[in-house]
């Protein structure tokens, strides 16, 4: 199965775009809510708040990963 390509948004489903075409760095896995991660553009750490995806369509612009900044 192909990995999902995500549009990463900050704060909400209509929040500012942090990154487009993000692919999670671990093969055969996807991020989960509550997880902390760094994006491939070098930004982070971020905490995953919400994942919205189109089942069976890994390269959809409607695959949205909502994140929030992790405070030190």
Predicted regions and their residues:
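Short alpha-helix capping/helix-loop boundary micro-motifs
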Residues: 19-27
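Short beta-strand-centered aromatic/proline hotspots
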Residues: 44-54
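Short, well-ordered loop/turn sites that connect or cap secondary structure elements
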Residues: 29-32
């Amino acid at each position: 199965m192909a990995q999902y390509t995500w549009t990463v948004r900050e704060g909400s489903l209509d929040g500012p775009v942090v990154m487009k075409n993000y692919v999670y760095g671990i093969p055969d896995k996807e991020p989960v809510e509550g997880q902390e991660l760094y994006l491939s553009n070098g930004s982070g750490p971020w905490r995953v708040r919400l994942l919205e995806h189109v089942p069976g369509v890994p390269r959809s612009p409607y695959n949205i990963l909502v994140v929030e900044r992790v405070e030190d």
